[in-house]
Amino acid sequence: MAGLINKIGDALHIGGGNKEGEHKKEEEHKKHVDEHKSGEHKEGIVDKIKDKIHGGEGKSHDGEGKSHDGEKKKKKDKKEKKHHDDGHHSSSSDSDSD
């Protein structure tokens, strides 16, 4: 079990088992800093998901700024019509019982 965990740790480069030669050089660390410091703000994936869930910046889930109120109202009206139509029709079996 411990061997398996150590193999996973080595593959993901986590844990304290690194040798001196395997450490990143200081130049490699600084090389990536320039990529992150461009002029625009990079939004994290968590922030993007939160915006989609909560409808951030006034946008709806489809991303076009449309309101879903009309769709909800249509569904509600359709549901009400369906309930009003149920059970008040005469069927062929009703006419046979006379």
UniProtKB/Swiss-Prot annotation:
Its main location: cytoplasm. Highly expressed in the cambial zone of the stem vasculature (at protein level). Expressed in roots, rosettes leaves, stems, cauline leaves, flowers and siliques. Phosphorylated in vivo. Phosphorylated in vitro by PXL1. One of its GO terms (biological process) is negative regulation of hydrogen peroxide biosynthetic process. InterPro entries: HIRD11-like. It comes from the Eukaryota. The keyword Metal-binding applies. GO terms for cellular component: cytoplasm; cytosol; nucleus. Disulfide bonds: none annotated. Induction: By cold stress. GO terms for molecular function: cobalt ion binding; copper ion binding; mRNA binding; nickel cation binding; zinc ion binding. It is found in: Cytoplasm; Nucleus. Keywords: Cytoplasm, Metal-binding, Nucleus. Residues 1-98 are annotated as: Disordered. Residues 19-72 have a biased composition (Basic and acidic residues). Belongs to the KS-type dehydrin family. Intrinsically disordered and metal-binding protein. Binds to the divalent cations cobalt, nickel, copper and zinc, but not to magnesium, calcium, manganese or cadmium. Binding to metal ions decreases disordered state, decreases susceptibility to trypsin and promotes self-association. Can reduce the formation of reactive oxygen species (ROS) in a copper-ascorbate in vitro system. Interacts with PXL1. This is Dehydrin HIRD11. It comes from Arabidopsis thaliana (Mouse-ear cress). The gene is HIRD11.
